[in-house]
Every structure is written in structure tokens, then in C-alpha cells.
From Swiss-Prot:
There is a cross-link at K137, K166, K293 (Glycyl lysine isopeptide (Lys-Gly) (interchain with G-Cter in SUMO)). One of its GO terms (molecular function) is RNA polymerase II cis-regulatory region sequence-specific DNA binding. Residues 117-148, 228-251, 297-349 are annotated as: Disordered. There is a cross-link at K137, K260 (Glycyl lysine isopeptide (Lys-Gly) (interchain with G-Cter in SUMO2)). It comes from the Eukaryota. Residues 125-140 have a biased composition (Basic and acidic residues). Residues 314-324 have a biased composition (Low complexity). This is Interferon regulatory factor 2.
């Protein structure tokens, strides 16, 4: 292979102008459109002198074939020529004018002028590279200029001082902390925000002189839940009001029946009273069934004691004592049963 050889485009022009290869000719010399015979060896068979003289000449020119030394290989010559034609940037195929079938198959190509030649894919013009390098170099300079413009409004004292920039992840605020050794006591630990964020942030600053925060009891006053209806009914049954207790205290008297003490109100109520239902039935005590027997001869509340004062003592007391005794025994037995069941839970009245 020769060290220096002619490039393919001028070599093709020389071959076309020689008129030594059949089928190779100019179709439009002004537009540089030419025709190359392109036979298919697999279909029609190879005639080296008729179908492959151009491919053979290119193989000899590139040093791939030496006449009289190498065996003829028109198929390889054609493949090498096609690859060389496709790699040229200044020659393109005119596919609408090419005929690829038949005994007279040929291809039409056009040589492009310098103005229409596309640049190579792997290379870029120097101007684009230089512009890109300049653009990359100018970006840090612009950022530093923007930072200096943000501090340019300060006095010359701050401009001379060295500053450190804190870069935080996902931070859009540049914070410049000025050196503390060069500042007075009035401007120590001062932070200058060059680019404040769009969203305002509320920051609470407290000092030692500020008052202590309000206690939790002041922030959340004590609240008492309302009393349920069941509790109200229970309290009304078990706990008397002040007026009732004031009126009823002087009238309560103690009585001893079968070794147990009971209270009775002789002035306004019957002789013996059972404790209220609230004292027997509550939320924390088992449900009990209490039976109260009604008196056969109830005493009116507005009558004086003892009843039937007009009657003789012997006649009036005898039936009353005989009739009231079983009633008293019945009440006492009921109270005794209930007190034995509840024992410690029921307090004595």
C-alpha cells in the first residue's frame, strides 16, 4: 500500500474523465452527477472486464490487489468500494435515479460543493468548542459577581473583611458570617442574607430577661364535666338539701329495735323510715330488690301524736299496739335482710 495516494473524489473524477470504463460517465457535469455500473454477481455472474473494472482499479489504487500476484476477487473489490463511497462526506447517492435491478443496473451519485458539505459527526468546529469553554469559565465569575453585588451596599469596612459562605443541602439562602475579630461589640454575630427566600419564616427569639412561659394550668384551665342524670338522681335521693337538713335535724330521734339503732321523725313523717334507694342501689353495688309493705292504718302527717286523744287510753292504745307490732316486725325483718346482704357496703342510717 503506498504511503501517499490520491483521495477518492479526485480519483473518481479522473476515472470518469478518462472514459476507459464502460458505464462510468457524467450525467450532469455542471452539477457533478455521475453514473456507476452496479451489477449483482450472484444473479448475473461476474465479467471482470465488463462489470468490475472500476472496483479492480480501486483495489489496485489502495494496494488491496496486485495484478499477477493476487487471485482476482471481484466480490471483495466491490464491497471495499461501496464502503469507501459511503464514508465520503462530499458524495451522496441520488436514490430516485438509481436502477438496482436488471442487466443494466447502475447507481447515480452527486459530488457536493464545499458550501453543502456537512461537517463530520465526530468533530465540531473550533468556534463551538471555544464558545462552550468560555461559557463554562464565565459561570463561576458571574456567581462571584452576583455575590459581591449583594454585599456592595455595605460600608467599605464590611467589604474588606473576609467572609465565609455556608452552603447547605437544598438551601436557597446564602448566609455570610462576618469575622467576629474585626467587628465591634454592637455588631458581633451579625448575619447578612443576600437572597432572602420568598416564604417568610417566623422565628421566636427569647432572652434571659424575658418572662418565663405561662404554666400549663393557665393555658389549659380546669374543666369539670357535667353531672349525668343518673348521678343527679342518686344525689337527690341520698343527699338532702340544706333546707331539708335544717328543718329535719331537730326532729330526728334514735330508736333501738332488736339491738339495732334507727332514726325516726315523729313530727312530719311516719314512725319508721327506710333508707333511700340510692344507698342500696348504686353503680358500684349489686342490684337488690327491696320490698316495702304499706301500713294498714297510716298516720296522717298533719295530725298530732299520739292519735285519737279523745279516746280512753286503754281502748286507743290496745288496738294500735297490736296492729303496729307486726308492721314494725315486718319492716325490721326487711331492713335486717338487706343489711345482712350488703354488710360493709351499706352504712347505717
Amino acid at each position: 500500500m503506498p504511503v501517499e495516494r490520491m483521495r477518492m473524489r479526485p480519483w473518481l473524477e479522473e476515472q470518469i474523465n478518462s472514459n476507459t470504463i464502460p458505464g462510468l460517465k457524467w450525467l450532469n457535469k455542471e452539477k457533478k452527477i455521475f453514473q456507476i455500473p452496479w451489477m449483482h454477481a450472484a444473479r448475473h455472474g461476474w465479467d471482470v472486464e465488463k462489470d468490475a473494472p472500476l472496483f479492480r482499479n480501486w483495489a489496485i489504487h489502495t494496494g488491496k490487489h496486485q495484478p499477477g500476484v493476487d487471485k482476482p476477487d471481484p466480490k471483495t473489490w466491490k464491497a471495499n468500494f461501496r464502503c469507501a463511497m459511503n464514508s465520503l462526506p462530499d458524495i451522496e447517492e441520488v436514490k430516485d435515479k438509481s436502477i438496482k435491478k436488471g442487466n443494466n443496473a447502475f447507481r447515480v451519485y452527486r459530488m457536493l460543493p464545499l458550501s453543502e458539505r456537512p461537517s463530520k459527526k465526530g468533530k465540531k468546529p473550533k468556534t463551538e468548542k471555544e464558545d462552550k469553554v468560555k461559557h463554562i469559565k464565565q459561570e463561576p465569575v458571574e456567581s462571584s459577581l452576583g455575590l459581591s453585588n449583594g454585599v456592595s451596599d455595605l460600608s467599605p469596612e464590611y467589604a474588606v473583611l473576609t467572609s465565609t459562605i455556608k452552603n447547605e443541602v437544598d438551601s436557597t439562602v446564602n448566609i455570610i458570617v462576618v469575622g467576629q475579630s474585626h467587628l465591634d461589640s454592637n455588631i458581633e454575630n451579625q448575619e447578612i442574607v443576600t437572597n432572602p427566600p420568598d416564604i417568610c419564616q417566623v422565628v421566636e427569639v427569647t432572652t434571659e430577661s424575658d418572662e418565663q412561659p405561662v404554666s400549663m394550668s393557665e393555658l389549659y384551665p380546669l374543666q369539670i364535666s357535667p353531672v349525668s342524670s343518673y348521678a343527679e338522681s342518686e344525689t337527690t335521693d341520698s343527699v338532702p338539701s340544706d333546707e331539708e337538713s335544717a328543718e329535719g335535724r331537730p326532729h330526728w330521734r334514735k330508736r333501738n329495735i332488736e339491738g339495732k339503732q334507727y332514726l325516726s321523725n315523729m313530727g312530719t313523717r311516719g314512725s319508721y323510715l327506710l333508707p333511700g334507694m340510692a344507698s342500696f342501689v348504686t353503680s358500684n353495688k349489686p342490684d337488690l330488690q327491696v320490698t316495702i309493705k304499706e301500713e294498714s292504718n297510716p298516720v296522717p302527717y298533719n295530725s298530732s301524736w299520739p292519735p285519737f286523744q279523745d279516746l280512753p287510753l286503754s281502748s286507743s292504745m290496745t288496738p294500735a299496739s297490736s296492729s303496729s307490732r307486726p308492721d314494725r316486725e315486718t319492716r325490721a325483718s326487711v331492713i335486717k335482710k338487706t343489711s345482712d346482704i350488703t354488710q360493709a357496703r351499706v352504712k347505717s342510717c
